[in-house]
């Protein structure tokens, strides 16, 4: 048993800055090991498995959808397990799936094993994102959730940005073995951080609550940390009315559970929260965002190869145009949500994406010389990247807001570990469903009708989402018991 002082290095291992760094590194590694394969995947299909050129788009979309489908299937179980076992243990365990998946992909000689590797990586992603975001929610103040998620997403977007480029360089220079070697180094660093981190729920058992700081540390000075509220103080402030953005109403009675619950809802208490339509809309935002991301992941490599005859390295470089806005605008987008609310961010982001998605059909018309056409393609991707950066956080923040209201109105209903692991499990379910549908729908539309029709369909989806966001996101206007 640990002594009264707790585990070795408790203070720094339980610091918010270290917890958030560990979570960010876990998500970063997950995205890198996903993105590092994107530019190499079409070439791997052809060179290792002799897939005909005409079928490469189909196989590429199918493998990406397999990964996302596994994430869909395991998201809710991961949320349930995190709420029962604790997020830190699950966060560490999820890495094992990723290690095995990476090794199988590097050395597999059959399509069946390649499918297995995608399934395992999808399982790992479901666990890592669900448990990781739950640890973030436990660590930061409610009023800082939007900025924190935006900052983390901006940080890990470096992985999204660098991975395709790195994958293209490594595959072109050293083949799949070079890709695996770099992946192994990242996994080793990630494993060390996950083994060391101590989450807040564990840390508070060993020390006085006043020594366990709750909010995000904006810098590392002791004076600043000393002025921060503690876990207990922050929890008290929540019960006194602290709210996540967007702030919508104070009707606590609406969120009060006043009926006998069935066995399924008692086992998964978050299910009751879906009586609130805003939670469904929050999940819809996550689905549509992922739908677009999955489509770009599946179609950008094949468009770049077929239209411009790019190598794997050049395909990786093209992704910079799409991912750079994430890095540049992620934190600003999160701050804007904390200040102006989810309605403004979701509405403006999806409205902005409408014309950007419509432009996707221009490059294939060859209206300008090849060099200018490449620049046009990259510019269109960058514009879409700006829109995607804006719509990254609203769904998460909206869902947290609704769930927090239920938690405050019903103390103890969600158990010792709270509702957020289950929430992020369901959020991941919707997100990865979009990530699974995106490659299939986008690949089908592009292969059968071309980029122009694909862009028009997605622009229509984005327009409808913008209208729904303007009318209903952040505002409780319909549903049972509303006034």
UniProtKB/Swiss-Prot annotation:
A Pfam family the protein falls into: MFS_1
Membrane-traversing stretches: 18-38, 62-82, 96-116, 149-169, 178-198, 281-301, 310-330, 344-364, 374-394, 424-444, 453-473
Glycosylation sites: 219
InterPro entries: MFS, MFS_dom, MFS_trans_sf, MFS_Vesicular_Transporter
One MF annotation (Gene Ontology) recorded for this entry: transmembrane transporter activity
Localisation: Membrane
One GO CC annotation: membrane
Alphabetical keyword list: Glycoprotein, Membrane, Transmembrane, Transmembrane helix, Transport
PROSITE patterns documented for this protein: MFS
Topology in the lipid bilayer: Multi-pass membrane protein
Family the UniProt entry places it in: Belongs to the major facilitator superfamily. TCR/Tet family.
Record's function text: MFS-type transporter; part of the gene cluster that mediates the biosynthesis of pyrrolopyrazines, secondary metabolites showing insecticidal activity. Probably involved in the secretion of peramine and other pyrrolopyrazines.
Protein name listed in UniProt: MFS-type transporter ppzB
Source organism: Metarhizium rileyi (strain RCEF 4871) (Nomuraea rileyi)
Lineage: Eukaryota, Fungi, Dikarya, Ascomycota, Pezizomycotina
């Amino acid at each position: 048993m640990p002594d009264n002082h707790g585990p070795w290095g408790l203070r720094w291992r339980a610091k918010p800055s270290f917890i958030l760094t560990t979570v960010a590194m876990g998500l970063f590694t997950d995205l890198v090991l996903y993105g590092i394969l994107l530019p190499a995947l079409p070439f791997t299909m052809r060179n290792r498995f002799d897939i005909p050129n005409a079928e490469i788009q189909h196989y590429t979309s199918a493998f990406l959808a397999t990964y996302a489908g596994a994430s869909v299937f395991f998201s809710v179980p991961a949320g349930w397990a995190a709420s029962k076992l604790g997020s830190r243990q699950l966060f560490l365990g999820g890495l094992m799936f990723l290690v095995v998946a990476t090794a199988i992909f590097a050395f597999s000689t059959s399509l069946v094993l390649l499918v297995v590797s995608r399934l395992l990586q999808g399982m790992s992603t479901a666990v890592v994102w669900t448990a990781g975001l739950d640890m973030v929610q436990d660590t930061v103040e409610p009023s800082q959730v939007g900025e924190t998620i935006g900052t983390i997403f901006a940080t890990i977007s470096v992985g999204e940005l660098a991975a395709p480029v790195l994958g293209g360089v490594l595959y072109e220079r050293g083949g799949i073995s070079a890709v695996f070697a770099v992946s192994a180094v990242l996994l080793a660093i990630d494993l060390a951080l996950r083994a060391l981190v101590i989450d807040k729920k564990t840390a508070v058992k060993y020390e006085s609550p006043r020594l366990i700081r709750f909010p995000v540390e904006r810098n590392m000075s002791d004076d600043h940390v000393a002025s921060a509220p503690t876990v207990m103080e922050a929890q008290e402030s929540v019960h006194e009315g602290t709210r996540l953005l967007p702030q919508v109403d104070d009707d606590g009675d609406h969120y009060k559970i006043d009926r006998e619950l069935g066995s399924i809802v008692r086992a998964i208490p978050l299910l009751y929260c879906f009586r609130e339509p805003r939670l469904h809309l929050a999940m819809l935002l996550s689905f549509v965002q992922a739908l677009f991301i999955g489509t770009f992941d599946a179609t950008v490599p094949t468009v770049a190869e077929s239209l411009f005859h790019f190598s794997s390295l050049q395909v990786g470089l093209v992704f910079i145009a799409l991912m750079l806005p994430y890095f540049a605008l992620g934190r600003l987008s999160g701050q804007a949500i904390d200040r102006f609310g989810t309605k403004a961010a979701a509405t403006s982001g999806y409205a902005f994406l409408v014309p950007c998605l419509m432009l996707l059909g221009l490059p294939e018309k060859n209206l300008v010389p090849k060099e200018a056409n490449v620049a046009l393609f990259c510019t269109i991707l960058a514009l879409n990247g700006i829109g995607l950066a804006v719509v990254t956080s609203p769904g998460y923040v909206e869902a947290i807001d609704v769930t927090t209201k239920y938690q405050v109105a019903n103390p103890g209903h969600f158990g010792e570990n709270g509702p957020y692991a289950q929430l992020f499990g369901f959020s991941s379910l919707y997100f990865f469903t979009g990530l699974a549908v995106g490659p299939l729908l986008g690949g089908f539309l592009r292969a059968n009708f071309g980029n122009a029709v694909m862009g028009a369909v997605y622009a229509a989806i984005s327009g409808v989402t913008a209208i729904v966001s303007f009318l209903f996101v952040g505002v409780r206007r319909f549903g049972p018991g509303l006034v």
